[in-house]
Amino acid sequence: MFHSEYEKKLRSPSKSPGSKTNYYNNYSNNNNNTPIPLPLSIFHSTYEDNGSNNNNNNNNNNINLNSNNNNNNSNNSGSNINNNITTPIKSTSTTTTTTTTPITTPTTTTTTTTTTPSYDSYGDRFIPLSIGLESQNNYSFDESSYEYLYCYPSENSYTIDKQRDESHLAYNIVLKNELLGSSLSSNFFDSPSSIYKSSIFNNNNNNNNNNNNNNNNNNNNNNNNHVNNNNNNNNNNNIDTPTNNNNNNNNNNNNNNVNINDTTATTTTTTTTNTNIPTTTTNATNNNNNNSNNTTTTTTTTTNTTNTTNTNTNTNTNNNLININQSPSKKQSLMSATMNNNNSNNNNNNNFGILKYNQKQKSTMSNHLDCSPYSLSLLSDDSQKLLSSPRKPQRKISKTPIKILDAPMIKDDFYLNLIDWSSHNILAVGLDTSVYLWNATTSQVSKLCEMESGQPVSSVGWIQRGGIHLAIGGTDGVVSIWDVNKKKKIRELQGHNTRVNALAWNNHILSSGGKDKVILHHDVRDCSNNYTNRLVGHRHEICGLKWSPDGQQLASGGNDNLLNVWDHSMTQQPQQQHQPPPPPPSSNTSSISQQQQQQNTSKPLYQFKFHYAAVKAIAWSPHQRGLLASGGGTHDKCIRFWNTTTGQSIQSIDTGSQVCNLAWSKNINELVSTHGYSQNQITVWNYPTMTPVTTLTGHTMRVLYLAVSPDGQTVCTGAGDNSLRFWNLFPSNKESSFSSNLDSFYNKKGLDIR
């Protein structure tokens, strides 16, 4: 079945180790230049003699052969064993012992290998293996098998197996290079970890003498007899060889960094070597135990060497199966710089920058602008930074009142309105049955009047233009008009049966609302003392009444939780001519006949039923036409905004306490609210965001009364704690003198109240 010569070669004894050494010498003498690797797809003949083995250049292996042919002082074979290669050789018993002794110069490494292989003879049959040899758990790898297969001439008894293994190994190399490129290591295939610790470029403190060949062989045939070999076997545990229960892999101290420094004093040589190599002995014995844990000892060697002579430096590229001999490209240089960014401060070559944790710098506005990468803004980064700069801080509002006045006998009644501030900067206050005036300019206090009926004052209201006439409502239903300069009562207006809770001026029209659920319009130019119109729309007493700034709409709030909006054009009705004057009031008859009430009755334009408590707080915005704000009582606690041009609700906010009063600032788009149960606070709101600007406290009881100064900066609040407090809440207005000029104009023109 077998050829006779072939069978003879198969049965011939194996060559002695000495022939292997001669092989190396012959190899070096016959190949002074760098050998050209054979094509990977060509199989070597199984009928070659011993001399033909010299042509086998061991393509695509990672063996460093460094020979000095002139003096033969040292033959240095750098055997950097890569754990990422597995050979399909079955071994029954393998014992390998490697001992490294801490010697400064020179360093001697003794390796004793005893191998008893057992092979299966397949004859002339060719049995293919799978592509990934390292993925086969039935095959184990050891250094002796690698040495026989790739370093020595082929043995006739093992030719078939070796040729098959070499071909598959070459195929694996080509396949991986096609997948990863020549610049990547095969460690990416063999390591099961998701984090790869590999060095693509040489990171050691040695010189790279790679002359564009696959075998890293640097033969310096010079007359200098000094050879300095720095063989760094840095495997760094980046190879994870699969093991199974039947075969254990022998780990022959591949993690030790050993620098062999041989110095021959034949020429003048200055070599400074500081080598600190701890003694490390690793015995890895395979006794077919079902133990897959390999003993691995890692020794870190720090070497500082200064050579001033010709140095032959042999450096393997850190376990790369295929050495990278091309000049690094720009991309590779950047990657190398990234991986070596920590080597300047640390002599340990095992520290790679790519595996270091870098603290992320805190992002600041000066570094970059945190904006969307899909932003379509045409502004530059500098412009965006400028626009995104912080706004001016909110103005500071003092939480301490600028002035506190005693107000004894002031009523603690939610339905009353007992303070008002005139355009002439005079504050009117109703205290029990009397009315007092406080001049804010001179701080003088004067008493205006005492109610003739002896009934308490229920409401006060200054005329808007002129500022010298004050309307006073009493609990007897009578409204009197006083000239404050002369301290004289000009007129008395009748029409209400009970107390008058609210008063509102609209030029020469005085509107009053009372406990009798009706609203009466009086034209003060008419001396007949008759009301011009009567508005009926509430089911309970009226406690809030305000005209819009343009004088076209009137808002009223009552204890029936209703907010009504009245149109002034609809309420104007021509008075009947020759109407007899009303009869004098008596205890048995009403001041207004039933016929007159039916003739002058109007209905509201809008009626809002969203509040759940009495509506006393009402305020029209001076900045937006038709914007109305209203506040509910204890069971509502909400501020609601309305569009009176469309009759729609805009928004609402829960304040958390009873809303007693509302007032807009004419200088800024803000409003102030006063509250009762349960917080008794004063809050300034920003509109339309309705974010609180500030909250003020000081009153010990419900803040039932509110008035704003004519300049719009100061507000006065009153409470049942018998005190009046003045607060600076709003900024000044550059056009604040405009209202004063109007007042001066109307004062000169005069308003004839008869």
UniProtKB/Swiss-Prot annotation:
Compositionally biased tracts (Polar residues): 326-339
Annotated SUPFAM superfamilies: WD40 repeat-like
Main subcellular localisation: nucleus
Keywords on record: Cell cycle, Cell division, Mitosis, Nucleus, Repeat, Ubl conjugation pathway, WD repeat
Any one GO molecular function term: anaphase-promoting complex binding
GO BP terms in the entry: anaphase-promoting complex-dependent catabolic process; cell division; positive regulation of anaphase-promoting complex-dependent catabolic process; protein ubiquitination
Pathway: Protein modification; protein ubiquitination
Annotated protein name in UniProt: Anaphase-promoting complex subunit cdh1
Organism of origin: Dictyostelium discoideum (Social amoeba)
Gene name for this UniProt entry: cdh1
